[in-house]
Amino acid sequence: MARVKRSVNAKKKRREVLKSAKGYRGQRSRLYRKAKEQMLHSKTYEFRDRKARKNEFRKLWIQRINAGARQNGMTYNRLIQGLRLAEIEVDRKNLAELAVNDFDAFTALCEAAKAALPEDVNAPAAS
């Protein structure tokens, strides 16, 4: 059998790993083994944080909606409940956008939600 020489492929692979590890601190950008380990970790973090980003944005939207709702004399929970009872379907991303950029439209939604809520706020909502 013919002998297989791998120096070209091995150097290419190492060069690609070190190129992608550019910007890391210390040995992680210069030594192949350290760079390879760091690349594996970074891919794991990248995957995890793509999932976490969705939760973080949802939390941010809820905080913005709650702040806008409290300026209109409501809480976030009552606003969402009122919007459901009024059969107004607006997602949290757009509600937060309205609360920040178009407060008059957000106030109109709050008024519609208030009107749809039952008189006794402590009573369970009609389903």
From Swiss-Prot:
The superkingdom listed in its UniProt entry is Bacteria
Record-level Gene Ontology MF annotations: rRNA binding; structural constituent of ribosome
Could you tell me which CDD domains the record lists for this protein? Answer: Ribosomal_L20 (cd07026)
- Per its UniProt record, what HAMAP family does this chain match? Ribosomal_bL20 (MF_00382)
What GO terms describe the biological role, i.e. biological process, of this protein?
A: ribosomal large subunit assembly; translation
Keywords linked to the UniProt accession: Ribonucleoprotein, Ribosomal protein, RNA-binding, rRNA-binding
The name of this protein is: Large ribosomal subunit protein bL20
Say what the protein does.
Binds directly to 23S ribosomal RNA and is necessary for the in vitro assembly process of the 50S ribosomal subunit. It is not involved in the protein synthesizing functions of that subunit.
